[in-house]
């Protein structure tokens, strides 16, 4: 709306003669221009507000954030499921570890009892022979039961000494084999699953070349 029309509307309205066709026409034009201007301004304000706050864009952003939260929650739940499954598997595999370790001590005692029988005594004493056979059967049955529950014997003879599975008690001079090669087993070792239940107590060779030790170690990993 022009300044002249504003002046007419504000200052000359009271002096306007409505009976005069020219004044009425001028007043009508001023009113039409006023309404047109304010209608345009109102529409521009609405469009500006729509640009500032777009409901659709806001909903899309919120939906994206919720989707990201859902994906993170799903990932956390999957990690929890895997960790729980692993813990359950470990508990099932290793729950008898302490019991199995105690049974290995019993097996050791049974073997010591058998070794204590003098040579030839079994053949000369039928009762002692039957007793020894019964002890052997008991020991074999007990070890078979432990094997069914994941207990396995370590066979370190001829292998390179590994502190994770072996416990060295003494050295055996022997220049024909690489250093730290297991030469003698004093007490058998056992594992359960991937864990050492009891390390094997061994004697290791002393005097072999380090080069031979390296070559043997490489060959064992090929």
Swiss-Prot record:
Q: Which CDD domains match?
A: GrpE (cd00446)
* Organism superkingdom: Bacteria
Chief location bin: cytoplasm
Q: Looking at the UniProt record for this protein, which Gene Ontology cellular component terms does it annotate, in alphabetical order?
A: cytoplasm
Which UniProt keywords are listed?
Chaperone, Cytoplasm, Stress response
Region entry Disordered, spans: 1-21
Subcellular location(s) per record: Cytoplasm
Biological process GO terms, please? protein folding
Q: List the disulfide bonds.
A: none
Q: Name the Pfam families for this protein.
A: GrpE
Matching entries from InterPro entries are given as: GrpE (IPR000740), GrpE_coiled_coil (IPR013805), GrpE_head (IPR009012)
Q: Which GO terms describe its molecular function?
A: adenyl-nucleotide exchange factor activity; protein homodimerization activity; protein-folding chaperone binding; unfolded protein binding
PROSITE patterns to which the protein is assigned, alphabetical? GRPE
Signal sequence bounds: none
What's this chain's function? Participates actively in the response to hyperosmotic and heat shock by preventing the aggregation of stress-denatured proteins, in association with DnaK and GrpE. It is the nucleotide exchange factor for DnaK and may function as a thermosensor. Unfolded proteins bind initially to DnaJ; upon interaction with the DnaJ-bound protein, DnaK hydrolyzes its bound ATP, resulting in the formation of a stable complex. GrpE releases ADP from DnaK; ATP binding to DnaK triggers the release of the substrate protein, thus completing the reaction cycle.
User: Matching PANTHER family, A to Z?
Assistant: GRPE PROTEIN, GRPE PROTEIN HOMOLOG, MITOCHONDRIAL
Partners and quaternary state?
Homodimer.
What HAMAP family does the annotation carry?
Answer: GrpE
Similarity remark: Belongs to the GrpE family.
What is this protein's record name? Protein GrpE
Gene for this chain: grpE
């Amino acid at each position: 709306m022009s300044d002249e029309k504003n002046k007419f509307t504000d200052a000359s309205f009271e002096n306007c003669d409505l009976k005069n066709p020219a004044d009425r026409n001028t007043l009508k034009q001023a009113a039409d221009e006023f309404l047109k201007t304010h209608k345009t301004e109102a529409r521009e304000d609405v469009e500006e507000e729509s640009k500032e706050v777009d409901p659709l864009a806001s909903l899309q952003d919120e939906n994206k954030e919720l989707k990201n939260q859902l994906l993170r929650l799903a990932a956390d739940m999957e990690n929890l499921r895997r960790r729980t499954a692993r813990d359950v598997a470990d508990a099932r595999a290793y729950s008898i570890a302490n019991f199995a370790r105690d049974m290995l001590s019993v097996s050791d005692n049974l073997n010591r009892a058998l070794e204590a029988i003098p040579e030839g005594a079994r053949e000369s004493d039928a009762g002692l022979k039957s007793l020894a056979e019964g002890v052997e059967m008991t020991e074999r049955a007990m070890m078979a039961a432990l094997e069914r529950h994941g207990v396995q014997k370590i066979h370190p003879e001829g292998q390179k000494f590994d502190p994770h599975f072996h416990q060295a008690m003494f050295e055996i001079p022997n220049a024909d084999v690489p250093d730290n090669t297991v030469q003698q087993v004093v007490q058998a070792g056992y594992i359960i699953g991937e864990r050492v239940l009891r390390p094997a107590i061994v004697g290791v060779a002393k005097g072999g070349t380090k080069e031979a030790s390296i070559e043997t170690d490489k060959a064992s990993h090929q």
